[in-house]
Amino acid sequence: MRFSKAYIKTLKETPKEAEIASHKLMLRAGMIKKLASGIYAYLPLGYRTIKKIENIVREEMDRAGALELLMPVVQPAELWQESGRWDVMGPEMLRLKDRHERDFVLSPTQEEMITAIIRSDISSYKSLPINLYHIQTKFRDERRPRFGLMRGREFTMKDAYSFHTSQESLDEEFLNMRDTYTRIFTRCGLKFRPVDADSGNIGGSGSQEFQVLAESGEDEIIYSDGSEYAANIEKAVSELINPPKEELKEVELVHTPDCPTIESLAKYLDVPLERTVKALTYKDMGTDEIYMVLIRGDFEVNEVKLKNILNAVEVEMATDEEIEKIGLKKGYIGPYKLPAKIKIVADLSVPEVSNHIVGSHQKDYHYKNVNYDRDYTADIVTDIRKVRVGDNCITGGKLHSARGIECGQIFKLGDKYSKAMNATYLDEKGKTQFMLMGCYGIGVTRTMAASIEQNNDENGIIWPVSIAPYIVDVIPANIKNEVQVSLAEKIYNELQEEKIDVMLDDRDEKPGFKFKDADLIGFPFKVVVGKRADEGIVELKIRRTGETLEVSQNEVIAKIKELMRIY
């Protein structure tokens, strides 16, 4: 491709709406164009990278034995009503009607569609297992689209779905997809971690995310320095270290003026936070039921764990009005001598604290020497604790934190959708069984953005060779110098013959202008044909390292091929 013929409109200044590196650089490099909030056109330069990522995904999915198909973007509402997710998905799912007033949705995901297809065609165990995938546009009406392609409303994803007759078969395919995703992200030149994750609205029994490591990542991931353990903060667990047990004492009501928080209470009574139990009130946003949630004073509640335990769509802290309406006193809530009927969820840490301090439901008073079992119990006792950096890992070592961008996720769905949508088969004995499902997604456009977040500097993008829109930029320093132009054309043609993606910057611009564009766009290699062109010598510049090599025109192709294997 000749730069003069390419559709590349670079910008000197960063548009005001851009906040993170990938958004800024894709706009400046002329890779995307914003058309509406969270909706972008992929311009030729950006689309080349998208296609390269898609090709890597296709090659590895095909290698893993999956079969490609293409499902529609518009789906009938009946499928979502059948699965039970028509109401669960909320306003993020865009609903629409056709001219006959029939309800449809603009696809946010494809579990319902693929299950409907498979159940109509497969009826015997002999046709299973099978894994089908497609690469398709998705739409999720995000409340607050931001960060460019990182959290847009329209995006490209690879979805794969597998169907099985046994848990062993599903487990095997889950590991197959884990290995496949590892190869995909490795080939894309990314630093990443597979981490245990929450399944969210998709559901199922097991899930892992593939987190691309970047300081700008929205997700916090937890990992051990002494084992392979890694998890999203929403799912992470750690060793619970309990305070020493004490002989049980009699409950006392103590005056605690101006101590509405657990920190102020512990300071006033001169006790460690771990000897207190804080009571929080949460509301199930689906049922409006209020719960009292108990946790040791030095810990925080993991709201995702709480949501899952309650089987809630979402949970939020109850308002002051809601708390008072059920007879509780904000700032002094506790489980002992409870004045209201309310279900209690307690963290595993709570029963292990002897003689703890809790609220009394009276302003400026607390109970001390309260003990679980003797003085109160909870309806549910389970892990709802948010882990902390420095905690002991359950598999050894200490826990650390990093930021990540979720670019892929794999799930064991089990029979959630097959039961809801009656996707069955006949087993070897002729008995009807529900299929077991797996689900495997990769955000293609997000992967492009994540790569930039991980690979950039003050001058622009630094593409890995495997997904760079063009690998080499050939630049004649002086477009009016026939020797330079002739040699640049020769190298350009030779690179094309070798099937290496190459751009010839044939614009009549100053060299510095061209160099800045090349660095902004992120070509892995620049071949600058300059003053030594008459000697057959060119400069080969490596974008990632900044290194410049002087290379003979007869060796430049071989050198580029060698460097491509490294970068």
Swiss-Prot record:
InterPro entries found in the cross-reference section: aa-tRNA-synt_IIb, aa-tRNA-synth_II, aa-tRNA-synth_II/BPL/LPL, Anticodon-bd, Anticodon-bd_dom_sf, Pro-tRNA-ligase_IIa, Pro-tRNA-synth_IIa_bac-type, Pro-tRNA-Synthase_IIa_type1
Signal peptide per UniProt: none
Subcellular localization, as worded in the UniProt entry: Cytoplasm
Domain of life: Bacteria
GO cellular component terms attached to this protein's record: cytosol
Catalytic activity: tRNA(Pro) + L-proline + ATP = L-prolyl-tRNA(Pro) + AMP + diphosphate
Gene Ontology BP terms: prolyl-tRNA aminoacylation
EC nos: 6.1.1.15
Matching CDD domains: ProRS-INS, ProRS_anticodon_short, ProRS_core_prok
Gene Ontology molecular-function annotations: aminoacyl-tRNA deacylase activity; ATP binding; proline-tRNA ligase activity
Keywords from the UniProt entry: Aminoacyl-tRNA synthetase, ATP-binding, Cytoplasm, Ligase, Nucleotide-binding, Protein biosynthesis
Principal location class: cytoplasm
Keyword field contains Nucleotide-binding: yes
Keyword Transcription regulation: no
Family note: Belongs to the class-II aminoacyl-tRNA synthetase family. ProS type 1 subfamily.
Protein role: Catalyzes the attachment of proline to tRNA(Pro) in a two-step reaction: proline is first activated by ATP to form Pro-AMP and then transferred to the acceptor end of tRNA(Pro). As ProRS can inadvertently accommodate and process non-cognate amino acids such as alanine and cysteine, to avoid such errors it has two additional distinct editing activities against alanine. One activity is designated as 'pretransfer' editing and involves the tRNA(Pro)-independent hydrolysis of activated Ala-AMP.
Note on domains (UniProt): Consists of three domains: the N-terminal catalytic domain, the editing domain and the C-terminal anticodon-binding domain.
Self-association and partners: Homodimer.
Protein name stated in the entry: Proline--tRNA ligase
Taxonomic lineage from the root: Bacteria, Fusobacteriati, Fusobacteriota, Fusobacteriia, Fusobacteriales
Gene that specifies this protein: proS
